[in-house]
Amino acid sequence: MKTKQSKILKSIYRPMHCDEFDLWADLSSNDYVEDLMTNHRYSRKKAQVEASKSFKTALPAGMLTPNNHFRTYEHDSQAVGYLWFSLEDNSAFLSDIMLIPEFQGKGMGRDFIRAFLNELASQGAFEVELRVSPDNQRALNLYKEFGFRITGFDMSLLLEPELSVIR
């Protein structure tokens, strides 16, 4: 009788390695550029300038910026996701979480968030906040599954130079 062997796939949530930081920063910056273009109607050039400025302001010492933490999610020995959060006074802010596109929709995002929330709980954190793009319905639904609730809305208005008076 033949038996079918199944390969056991292993997922690991771990601190990001130094050599992964630049790759993550490029991926994250590109995502932020797309977000700024879509949700703020920035030109690509303006979005790239803003994204670069934001990263330099938020992470002046890169991976060594105090109170900022970086994680990698591995699946079957391959890095498939990255996460950046800050933790201060037992309150966390999730600045970025991403899964490589070909690994989305397979339950890994759920496992990644669960591992992150368990880490925070084990460190005594009492809350976590985040911002999500309004057009990212998949992420909104996932966060709601974990009990996140909407606490406000970011709003913006582009002022056009040719408008001298707003009525």
Where are these regions (language model features)?
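Conserved beta-strand-loop-alpha-helix junction that forms the acyl-donor binding cleft
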Residues: 130-140, 156-161
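Conserved acetyl-CoA-binding loop-helix of GNAT-fold acetyltransferases
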Residues: 99, 105-122, 137, 141-145
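Terminal substrate-recognition subdomain of acyl/acetyltransferases
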Residues: 2-4, 156-167
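Acetyl-CoA-dependent GNAT
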Residues: 6, 11, 15-95, 100-102, ...
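Structured loop/turn residues at beta-strand edges in well-structured enzyme cores
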Residues: 78, 123, 149
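Conserved acetyl-CoA-binding loop of GNAT-fold acetyltransferases
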Residues: 144-153
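Conserved GNAT acetyl-CoA-binding A-motif
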Residues: 120-131, 154
